[in-house]
């Protein structure tokens, strides 16, 4: 990251994985309650912020099918400006790497990085919990990225506790298909009654079991997505002879954990050439973590 008086450049908006995802119920308002472990990755979009004196919030990067007014970065900046009454403006540039509809949290992470970066650039000094409350207005996953540590999440994803996860390298494969989260949540076949866990149920296994992630829990959305999207099923079948794998979030990305980068890259080399993939390391903390207290 490069910081000047008027800009913050090369700000990573890290991807996330759901190491497991259990849906434990459905609230009267229609939102689902869940339990998951969020794992940060050292891979994601890169954002650049330049302060504007005219108070305008703009996005100078063209993104297909995402007009600026619908972009979560612009919405995050607008929300923060309204909340604080700041006279400042900003221009946002985005180097987009994470695919949309992939279960990697790309848009949510972009929004959180925007909140953290502008907290610094605009000299707002809002505490982390206040930023997390704002983040929840932008989406269920956004508070986690502001929280900035690997976490056990409950509720709709906003109740967060830090978890210590072993260092890993991951091979992430994303089929060329967009999976709409809302549509999967509305499926009648979706399991909504997984038995709630406690945070003490899994830390020891996470740190010592070589078969993680297959050894603990599951993704309750995976079976539904596999039934609707043959591309996701195909990737999971490919992994059966390579390493234990599962889907992240509502898909479409599928991941497997490896002890070393070399092992992950060796598996990646065997992939069909037409599949999108990345090898990435785990991350313990959001790169902009210190921009809130």
Curated annotation (Swiss-Prot):
SUPFAM superfamilies: GHMP Kinase, C-terminal domain (SSF55060), Ribosomal protein S5 domain 2-like (SSF54211)
Keyword annotations: ATP-binding, Isoprene biosynthesis, Kinase, Nucleotide-binding, Transferase
EC identifiers of the protein: 2.7.1.148
Pfam families according to UniProt: GHMP_kinases_C, GHMP_kinases_N
Catalytic site positions: 16, 141
Substrates-to-products reaction catalysed: 4-CDP-2-C-methyl-D-erythritol + ATP = 4-CDP-2-C-methyl-D-erythritol 2-phosphate + ADP + H(+)
Enzyme class: transferase
Function recorded in the entry: Catalyzes the phosphorylation of the position 2 hydroxy group of 4-diphosphocytidyl-2C-methyl-D-erythritol.
PANTHER family from the UniProt entry: 4-DIPHOSPHOCYTIDYL-2-C-METHYL-D-ERYTHRITOL KINASE, CHLOROPLASTIC
Protein name per its UniProtKB record: 4-diphosphocytidyl-2-C-methyl-D-erythritol kinase
Species for this entry: Paraburkholderia phytofirmans (strain DSM 17436 / LMG 22146 / PsJN) (Burkholderia phytofirmans)
Name of the gene this protein is made from: ispE
């Amino acid at each position: 990251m490069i910081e000047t008086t008027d800009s913050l450049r090369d700000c990573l908006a890290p991807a996330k994985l759901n190491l497991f995802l259990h849906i434990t119920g459905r609230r009267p308002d229609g939102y689902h309650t869940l339990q998951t472990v969020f794992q940060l990755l050292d891979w994601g979009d890169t954002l650049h912020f330049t302060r504007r004196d005219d108070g305008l919030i703009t996005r100078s990067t063209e993104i297909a099918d995402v007009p600026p007014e619908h972009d979560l970065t612009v919405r995050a900046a607008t929300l923060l400006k309204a909340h604080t009454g700041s006279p400042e403006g900003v221009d946002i540039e985005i180097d987009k790497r994470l695919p949309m509809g992939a279960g990697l949290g790309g848009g949510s992470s972009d929004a959180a990085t925007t909140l953290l970066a502008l907290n610094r650039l605009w000299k707002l000094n809002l505490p982390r919990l206040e930023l997390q409350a704002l983040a929840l207005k932008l989406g269920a996953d956004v508070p986690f990225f502001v929280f900035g540590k690997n976490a056990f999440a409950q509720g709709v994803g906003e109740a967060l506790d830090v978890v210590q996860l072993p260092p890993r390298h991951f091979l992430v494969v994303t089929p060329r298909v967009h999976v709409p989260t809302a549509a999967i949540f509305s499926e009648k076949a979706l399991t909504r009654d997984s038995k709630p866990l406690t945070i003490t149920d899994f830390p020891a296994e996470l740190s010592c079991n070589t078969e993680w992630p297959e050894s603990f829990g599951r993704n309750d959305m995976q079976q539904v997505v596999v039934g609707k999207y043959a591309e996701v099923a195909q990737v999971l079948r490919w992994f059966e002879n390579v390493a234990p794998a599962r889907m992240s979030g509502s898909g479409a990305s599928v991941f497997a954990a490896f002890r070393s980068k070399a092992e992950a890259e060796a598996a990646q080399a065997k992939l069909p050439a037409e599949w999108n993939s990345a090898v990435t390391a785990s991350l313990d903390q959001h790169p902009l973590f210190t921009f809130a207290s």
